[in-house]
Swiss-Prot record:
It catalyses: N(pros)-phospho-L-histidyl-[protein] + H2O = L-histidyl-[protein] + phosphate; N(tele)-phospho-L-histidyl-[protein] + H2O = L-histidyl-[protein] + phosphate. Monomer. Its EC number is 3.9.1.3. This is 14 kDa phosphohistidine phosphatase. It holds the Pfam family Ocnus. One of its GO terms (cellular component) is cytosol. The modification N-acetylalanine is found at A2. Coiled coil: none annotated. One of its GO terms (molecular function) is protein histidine phosphatase activity. Keywords: Acetylation, Cytoplasm, Hydrolase, Protein phosphatase. Substrate binds at K21, T94, M95, A96. It comes from Pongo abelii (Sumatran orangutan).
Length: 125
């Protein structure tokens, strides 16, 4: 996948309501025989169906590999999404991957949901 194609991968894909697990993932073009990775981007993925953070990462990384990209999980936590109140709160951590940099996650979420109040905290699980 060419670096320009990374722009076609949505920065944020989260469920519309509820409290659920999320992961922050760095996606980059698959390197060829040790060649340096030209460009990467971080994406936020959070879904109610996931029992574990690894379930999200495994699905997303599999999808990205099919598109010619490599991934690394940068951490995770939970998202509380209240669409009626237009509020999203990002918090906590994942036992498997550690805490994500919630500040990065919330900036990406704010870009997708500009009319929402988006907050974050490191506490909670």
């Amino acid at each position: 996948m060419a670096a320009a194609d990374l722009a076609h991968i949505p920065d944020v894909d989260i469920d519309s309501d509820g409290v659920f697990k999320y992961v922050l993932i760095r996606v980059h073009s698959a390197s060829r025989s040790g060649a340096p990775v030209a460009e990467s981007k971080e994406i936020v993925r959070g879904y109610k169906w996931a029992e574990y953070h690894a379930d999200i990462y495994d699905k997303v990384s599999g999808d990205m590999q099919k598109q010619g990209c490599d991934c690394e999980c940068l951490g995770g936590g939970r998202i509380s999404h209240q669409s009626q109140d237009k509020k999203i709160h990002v918090y906590g951590y994942t036992m498997a991957y550690g805490p994500a940099q919630h500040a990065i996650s919330t900036e990406k979420i704010k870009a997708k949901y500009p009319d929402y109040e988006v907050t974050w905290a490191n506490d909670g699980y």
